[in-house]
A protein has these predicted regions:
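Residue-level signal for short segments within beta-strands and strand-turn junctions
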Residues: 10-12, 24, 49, 85
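Short, mixed-charge low-complexity intrinsically disordered segments
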Residues: 38-87
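Short aromatic-glycine-(Arg/Gly/Cys) micro-motifs in beta-strand/loop hairpins
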Residues: 1-19
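Short stretches within intrinsically disordered, low-complexity N-terminal or propeptide regions
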Residues: 14, 22, 31, 44-45, ...
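Intrinsically disordered, low-complexity segments enriched in proline/serine/threonine
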Residues: 6, 24-26, 54
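Intrinsic-disorder/low-complexity coil detector
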Residues: 3, 21-23, 51
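Short, flexible N-terminal segments of the mature chain
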Residues: 19-41
């Protein structure tokens, strides 16, 4: 029996496409997700002086939501992180 792979997917509403990263364990995938969330949060807080709302969408999906007025237009950026098990 082969061990499952865990895929971390990051999608942002202000970017086209997504990124996917494989991990050998669920713990490694969630550790990487937490690092990505911290990095994205720091980048937005530094650039736009905004703090995100964190929304737990389901057991495997977490979303950061940044509401802002950028370039004189209302803009909501949603960054979603998902971890899936692939057997």
């Amino acid at each position: 029996m082969t061990k499952p792979t865990y895929i971390l997917i990051r999608e942002a509403s202000n970017e086209s496409g997504y990124t996917a990263h494989p991990f050998p364990s669920e713990k490694a995938a969630y550790t990487a997700m937490n690092c990505m969330m911290k990095s994205d949060t720091a980048a937005i807080e530094t650039t736009y002086h905004l703090t995100p709302r964190v929304e737990q969408v389901s057991n495997y999906k977490t979303r950061l939501i940044f509401d802002a007025i950028i370039a004189e237009s209302d803009m909501t950026v949603k960054i979603t992180y998902s971890v899936f098990e692939v057997k």
